[in-house]
Amino acid sequence: MRTLVWMAATFVLVTLSLEAQAKDLGKNSRFVCSWGSDIAAGAQASKLSGLTLYGARRKLQARKFPRPWMRMTAMGITEQTYNSPSRLKPSDIKQTYYEQCIKHELAQR
């Protein structure tokens, strides 16, 4: 019984500390992570549907981006996604990318 209480207390404390860390990120960092996760999910969907990397690049070239750095970053994310042997669903890729991006941003602080 005591072990169960300690495990529950530890879980609650870890959850609260992670939430507190996530709140330290600025709006821009969250936007960049969200945007990147959308690009990664789209690339994974294209890959799983059979679209070639060349075709995915052409779609990105035709797309309008609000910031100059976004086009090349999207190309890099797409290429890394295509080079990965992963067959995960796009929603799983999106979640994983976002979590790792947030973790990376927090580690840089």
Question: Which residues are covered by each model-predicted region?
Answer:
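Bacterial N-terminal signal peptides that target proteins for export
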Residues: 1-8
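N-terminal signal peptide c-region/cleavage motif recognized by signal peptidases
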Residues: 15-19
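Short intrinsically disordered terminal tails
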Residues: 1, 20, 107-109
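N-terminal secretory signal peptides
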Residues: 20-59
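Compact alpha-helical subdomains of small soluble proteins
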Residues: 51-109
